[in-house]
Amino acid sequence: MDLQPSIDVTSPDQYSAGTPTPAAIVAGEVPASEAPRPLSAFDMFSIGIGPSSSHTVGPMRAGLAFSTELCALPDYSHLSHVTIDLFGSLGATGRGHNTDRAVLLGLAGYDPETVSIETVESLIPQIASSGRLPFAGGREIPFDIESDIRFLPRTVLSYHVNALTITAYAGESLVLERTYYSVGGGFVMAQTNNDPEHPEIASLASAQETTGMCTPAPYPFSTAAQLLAQCTRSGLSIAEVVRANELSARSEVALDAYLDQIAHTMFHAIEAGISSTGILPGGLDVPRRANALAAQLRARAEKAFSASERRGWAGVMQDPLRAMDWVNLYALAVNEENAAGHRIVTAPTNGAAGVIPAVLGYLVAFCPEAGASFPDFSPSNLAGISELPLDESSESASCRRASIHEFLLAATAIGALIKTNASIAGAEVGCQGEVGSASAMAAAGLAQALGGTPQQVENAAEIAMEHSLGLTCDPVGGLVQIPCIERNAIAAVKAINAARMALWGDGRHTVS
């Protein structure tokens, strides 16, 4: 039986022989023209379900890749059972992050971008009651949740701390075995040999991503210095450099439609979080707060204050920090949706999914540069922030769409730099790699949308990242709730402050 990989793998591991390493690129030993193609907005932003990109979205994609490959094998018709081994961090916090459920959803043929929340919540009870796994391809096989999924936190594979192995059998015969590594942000690597000490690694990629990786970028960069040099030589902004790279691999219509989809999904997550009440799952009894906070802020926005009240900060128009309350609301709403296992945008991870939507919400609600008619625009937005049009229907809508696209493209550049040269995986580098990265991306995006120069945009990201260093990944009970939800709100406010600090300077700074 041929057990060699038949999965769609591209983009050899960046650390393999002959490929420039991040250290060599940072040291200036490799020119930009020889650096790997920068990661895309399609890489840095993806739609999925909570609560974790590395522990939920990635394992679900791994399960789907395994089932897709397995269904194409001739022995699939004789499939009798499947086992799942979760190693390292996946084994340690997998229960709190629903890693087991995520892998089973993937094996059942579901994708994190499109699976319904009803299916997500019903699959485990269905398997537990029937003792059968509805496998992709229409088959059902016996499955015991207690014995066929093993949590092995003390076993850490050599390539990455987030690893899982899925094995399929026909009776006593091995049909297929694959080991996957969920390396953060929903990115998944597949092991293509059977040597655990010297694994050969390749990334799982869609056909669209494969096409993009094979197309040279007109403005390649792997460091901030290279990015700024490309901007200086071309006269383009950071967002324009990223857009040009994107358009070398896909059409403008496809790019803009994807950016619209990402923005709408972020705004819908805000609205969903605001409209939901109750206790978050997992056993910590953490109550949702966004709904009550939204009601309080709306009441304050509509209240008629007395003359004495208006002399204080109680008057909504007199409160100099009123926007901060709405930013906090947006971040809390998204991260409560993530903690509930609902649909959000991985940006760049699920644990940090509330930062960029919160700052994006600030941009469209409070900034005239994005079409907001401040101070007349009411941030209470009773119609819902997700209903704000992103089209050519009006000057403000067109301005809003352009600002959002600039924001997301500049954020992509910063996220790509961090992912290439460091890590966005909390299990690998702590929360500085998740919330810190998201704060830096959001700061850069906001500075770009507010008209910052490339140097100011880079400086905004640097300020936000510098003051996120040292954050640990310390979720209580292995759940993405405490301190994660509040930490997103703090990071969003930090991003706005970083952008404003950078915009008052000329972009020159000491730390890089």
Predicted regions and their residues:
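Hydrophobic alpha-helical bundle architecture
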Residues: C399, A410, A416-N488, M501-T510
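Beta-strand segments within the central parallel beta-sheet cores of soluble alpha/beta enzyme folds
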Residues: D75-G88, G371-L382, P389-D391, E395-A413, ...
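Alpha-helical support elements that line or immediately flank enzyme active sites
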Residues: S54-C71, P357-E369, A443-G451
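Intrinsically disordered, low-complexity terminal tails and inter-domain linkers enriched
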Residues: P5-P31, A370-C399
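C-terminal regulatory domains involved in ligand/effector binding and gene-expression control
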Residues: D111-W313
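Accessory "access/gating" subregions that flank catalytic or transport cores
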Residues: E252-F374, S396-G430
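Conserved phosphate/anionic-ligand binding catalytic regions in large, soluble enzymes, centered on
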Residues: F45-A65, A339-V359, V429-A440
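N-terminal signal-anchor module of multipass membrane proteins
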Residues: E34-I49, A65, H81
